[in-house]
Amino acid sequence: MTSILTNIAAMAALQTLRTIGSNMEETQAHVSSGLRVGQAADNAAYWSIATTMRSDNMALSAVQDALGLGAAKVDTAYSGMESAIEVVKEIKKKLVAATEDGVDKAKIQEEIDQLKDQLTSISEAASFSGENWLQADLSGGAVTKSVVGSFVRDASGAVSVKKVDYSLNTNSVLFDTVGNTGILDKVYNVSQASVTLTINTNGVASQHTVAAYSLESLTQAGAEFQGNYALQGGNSYVKVDNVWVRAETAATGATGQELAATTTAAGTITADSWVVDVGNAPAANVSAGQSVAGINIVGMGAAALDALISGVDAALTDMTSAAADLGSIAMRIDLQSDFVNKLSDSIDSGVGRLVDADMNEESTRLKALQTQQQLAIQSLSIANSASENVLTLFR
């Protein structure tokens, strides 16, 4: 049946053309954006996952920047510590030279003073972005410095930022800006041999041997004793069987000295019936040293110089340990930086598998749709021409 009111063939061809046009728009959008899931309407589940992971990847990018900043801080501190170690080695060399008979110690002291000034200069200059890890205010205890290490999303979806911590304490900073507890400004107390102490408890005597030691001094009331020897308020203390006993040299004329404390806290010193016999503890064996920053060898005897060299060597040991810690932190930051880079690439790859368009497939499909569109246009043209043929019947 041929109708001039309803052209069914033209309607069918037009519907086909509309469908092809819609498919072409979708395919062209995939080709132009490179995404087969560009919005939630395309695939809500994949779009949601991709959006979340892209957000996490942006956070990882910030972590990468923070790791770079942290690496710069650590590298600066390490370089400063390494330079300071070389200077302290030179100071130790000067002290060894000063033990030679007939040496002008005043001249050597002048050289040491210059080296001490260099240590101060290194410590003050080892700063990056306002952060200085070689000197700190330790009056309130250790100070923790942190470097952002990673961004984590757990199984429940909760997010957190993990950090790499580094403690600025008496064994890691060169100078305490308020007190005297840094490696270079604290006093190292050194003994050159073991000391045999006779302890009398209510008339019962027993002997105890305290081995050679190199330990820190106490700087404030209430601080805890550390190690086997400490200096507080001008008094020397030794730790025997977990009891702190105050000792004096034979030069004081005292045959004994009352006990110090029954606990490890300096603020709880009490009188007791303990007595230490110092007859076997000559002055050379229980000696107070100097800080590296306060070294003054003018007029110093051979025994004191030997003890001072041991103290400087103890400071070098602490500095070497601190440099090793900084090196370990630097290595960890480098490893974490590499991991974050790889993790970011993995996330990009995973998101791509979910939402990226296959350009080979899309280009092939676009070519096919263009051919279909041309055929649909031709079909519509043929269908429209059928109505024109009706006019020939009336000629």
Curated annotation (Swiss-Prot):
The keyword Secreted applies. It comes from the Bacteria. The keyword Transcription does not apply. It is found in: Secreted; Bacterial flagellum. InterPro entries: Flagellin (IPR001492), Flagellin_C (IPR046358), Flagellin_N (IPR001029). GO terms for molecular function: structural molecule activity. It holds the Pfam family Flagellin_C. Keywords: Bacterial flagellum, Secreted. GO terms for cellular component: bacterial-type flagellum; extracellular region. Flagellin is the subunit protein which polymerizes to form the filaments of bacterial flagella. Belongs to the bacterial flagellin family. This is Flagellin B. The lineage of its organism: Bacteria, Pseudomonadati, Pseudomonadota, Alphaproteobacteria, Hyphomicrobiales.
